Amino acid sequence: MSRSSYIFTSESVSEGHPDKVCDRISDTIVDLFLGKDPEARVACETLTTTNQIVLAGEVRCAAPIDDAEIEAAAREAVRDIGYEQDGFHWETATLQNFLHEQSVHIAQGVDASGDKDEGAGDQGIMFGYASDETPQLMPAPITYSHQILKRMAELRKSGARPEFEPDAKSQVTMRYENGVPAGVTSVVVSTQHKDGLTQDDIRELVRPVVQDVLPEGWFPPEEEFYVNPTGTFVIGGPDGDAGLTGRKIIVDTYGGAAPHGGGAFSGKDPTKVDRSAAYACRWLAKNVVAAELAKRCTIQVSYAIGVSKPLSLYVDLHGTGRVDEAKLEDALRQLADLSPRGIRTRLQLNKPIYARTAAYGHFGRTPTEDGGFSWERTDLADELRSLL
């Protein structure tokens, strides 16, 4: 039996966190290639450490892209995040590029040819989730955790809070009653900052940000409001900790409130079902909840490398559904082509829309006119209602 009253926590990390720097660089490279060739293949991994950026992976592109373009794109990503520190500077960090041509053995399984449809880029399982507890149809703890850090970054970049530096983390613990968010029991924020500031200084700079983000009356007790609990946080970013692409997969998704198939998103073109199928599952789950067929919805799909059709589709409405789950599965199969090509076509994923996803969550965002966050549209809700 599921519990209706409990306490749950999610965390987020800022765009300047070392792993997120790597995600941003990797997705910037994906965008660079897709901007030249919508059918480009990219698997770009990034490592960062003190004044070092290392790119590695496999690519294929119909248009020429030279090393200078790749390096310029990576440096611009770091510049936009805001790193101009002695230990990590967008302009002076050493960049090593080990990207090379995609394996023909992988390509032969993925590419369409003759009567063979485009296959999945790998085997695996992917999940999507939605909940009606926030307007974004996302879990509340991860939503507020993202919003705190996004607001801090906006203040830093605008010059309103120059005391903040790019590297930061947040964590929000919420109390649920009858399965509904009822308050915040604690908030943790750790942020890199300019030298010469005390812990109390940073605490009072962070306080209004948290107050603005949380609903009125939800600010935690003073003793449960933690800011830079270890004290000074001047050395940070890749200079403080090495970063790698794909290490913040729970931050990227649902903050631990839903299962994760294990595959990271950043650095991958949309033929990789780790990314595209997870986006499709979120799209389907969000439309189920938007159609008011359930308060919560988890969807799982699975694939085999080189095979176009998904091997399975599973729906769990967590006891909140107004429809039979097996019938809902049939309706989703009828309405959505979940082959890799079907997903890319329906969600228009062959576009340079990925750098913007690299921080503050891939889900719960606002769709844009250029096709960004297309998986957040609720354009399937009416059709689902009519079928069920």
From Swiss-Prot:
Region listing for Flexible loop, in residue ranges: 102-112
A Pfam family it matches: S-AdoMet_synt_M
Entry binding sites for ATP: 17, 167-169, 241, 247-248, 264, 268
Enzyme Commission no: 2.5.1.6
Binding-site residues for L-methionine, renumbered to this chain: 58, 102, 241, 272
GO MF annotations, alphabetized: ATP binding; magnesium ion binding; methionine adenosyltransferase activity
Sites where the protein binds Mg(2+): 19
Binding locations of K(+): 45
Cofactor(s) this protein requires: Mg(2+); K(+)
Swiss-Prot/TrEMBL keywords: ATP-binding, Cytoplasm, Magnesium, Metal-binding, Nucleotide-binding, One-carbon metabolism, Potassium, Transferase
Cofactor note as given: Binds 2 divalent ions per subunit.
Name of the protein described by the UniProt record: S-adenosylmethionine synthase
Origin organism lineage: Bacteria, Pseudomonadati, Pseudomonadota, Alphaproteobacteria, Maricaulales
